[in-house]
Amino acid sequence: MDFSLKKLAAATLVLASLSSFTTPAFANLTAQQSADILTTFNDASVKDFRQFLGRVAKSDVAKTDALAPSISAFLGNKTLSAEQQNEIHRLLGLYARLKYGAAATETLRELVAIPTVRADGVPQHENPEFLKIADKIKSLAQSFNLDFRNIDNRVYEVSLKGSGKEVVGIHAHADVVPVTPENWVLQDGTRLDPFKVTLIGDRMYGRGTEDDKNGIVVALYAMKVIKEEKLPLARHFKLVIDTTEETAGDAIPYYFERNPVPEYNLALDGSYPVVIAEKGYGTVMATFARRKAEGSGAEITSMTGGLATNQIPSRSVATFVTDTPAELAEALQKAGADYAKRNGGNFQIDAKVRGKDVTLTVTGVSAHSSEPQSGVNPVARMLDFINSLDGNIALKRNHITDAARYAADNWGLDYLGSKLGVGFSDEFMGPLTASLTYVAMDDKAFKLAVNLRVPKGKSPETLKSDIAGKLDAWTRKSHITPVFELSVAEPMYRNPEGEWVKALLSVATENLDMAHQFGTSAGATSVHELPNGVQFGLAKPDVKYTGHTDGEFKTTGQFLMDLQIVTEMMGRIGQLPKL
């Protein structure tokens, strides 16, 4: 849309009337006042934005909050001050929440029902589930009168056009991490289907509700509102939907090799209010060649862990083969209780006889590996416990006991890299974290991953060299020789300036009643390498992040707040005269 200033003035908000300001202009509407508006109106009473504003202007809320002048100026197509403009955008977000909250919730249900998990041996862009979600997003975009492009089934792009040349990229992703269905059980015994949104209380359980199909949905509906209300924009918005964010990470580079990079980039895949720093993502993958068991006693034949390197599961299960299962189960149960008591008592170890085998289960608390402090890692505890049995319960030595010794000697239950001696911290970004996560075994090898989250303060090459040197010393001492693969990415640290970032900070902190300051994250997103890249929600930093966990959920209140915030943000950023 190529609006002239005359047309802009006649349409709705007048871009020409806004002057650049060096301090953020606030919307004179508190979180409590917004809540009062939400309780006064409902979706059935809201037809369009102008009708909504007219009704708000006549309400007691407007009189109390002095909103009438802003609404009157807007409806009369008059020049708005920066503060008035921001009040109108705040009301736009509230309108979107009231008008489309129920529809957006239903769309989230539909997207979660598509299991967009990586399939072994199938490229993501050929996976039928991704073709299905691409068609669904295309259908939604077109029904919202938005432009849709499918870039070779790798990235889905939805565009909202403005009048200028600048482009703001809004980033979300359609892929999700794998699930272990048997772990999706609530404390009261309720079993959940990971790919069906289940509403219990205010929690919407389902894989992708938090990470990151919610981001796709709220961005689409925010675009819809701005489009159908014909609000003029000084720049374009592109919703860039990644398909490999949780795995190879090759879809976004593929996209930008063929398409221009937006000047500004916001990831709806992290934390509020505005995150300007992301730790670097790293992996220490140890591969233990399968070997014939040696010695006497029981043999551990299998062990489970996370299904992805960035996932701390709620349970780890090991299978023991023995001639005396009842006696072994009893001994493991007693040893497990003692071990749990010595190590915090915040996890459980259970041994049960299954035919001729014994199944050992360590139950902890699932977490995203970027926040190991929010969980209790059962993988680390399983391996450390197995290693602690040496000399107490007879076990044959094989590749799994080798891995247990490696884990116990080098990583232990500590997730700060202290045991290996590689820990360090940055005052703003926080400490390095190192979490035992992924476990896999085939007929050739047993694999065990440690997921690293690395702050600024030490170069990736230096850190890799430190880790490699210490692990090499351990292999010489232990005579256990796994193959190690190390990777460490640079952390992201930005010092953004300009009206755009002031606006982002104001929108998030005012709506969420948060401190007006930038944040940092241990999670890496699609904007890690992109210009002017920041995270803009959609999780609150003081609330446990449930993405990647068993029993992932998003609260209905926060989901609707996200819709409100993202709509307000797009209206406000879209109409700033200068970013």
Please give the residue ranges for each predicted region.
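Acidic-enriched catalytic cores of C-N bond-cleaving enzymes acting on peptides and small amides
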Residues: I276-T304, T309-V362, S369-T433, T437, ...
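A short beta-alpha structural unit
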Residues: T401-A408, T437, N451-K456, T481-V501, ...
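Alpha-helical metal-binding/catalytic segments enriched in His/Glu/Asp
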Residues: I170, T198-T247, V284-K292, S316-E327, ...
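C-terminal catalytic subdomain
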Residues: M441-K464
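Gram-negative bacterial Sec-dependent N-terminal signal peptides
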Residues: M1-A27
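Acidic/histidine-rich catalytic neighborhood of metal-dependent amide-processing enzymes
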Residues: D212-R291, Q333, D414-E427
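Acidic/His- and Gly-rich active-site-bordering loop/insert found
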Residues: N28-Y205, L233
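Zn-dependent metallopeptidase/amidohydrolase metal-coordination segment
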Residues: N28-N42, T361, D442-K444, R453, ...
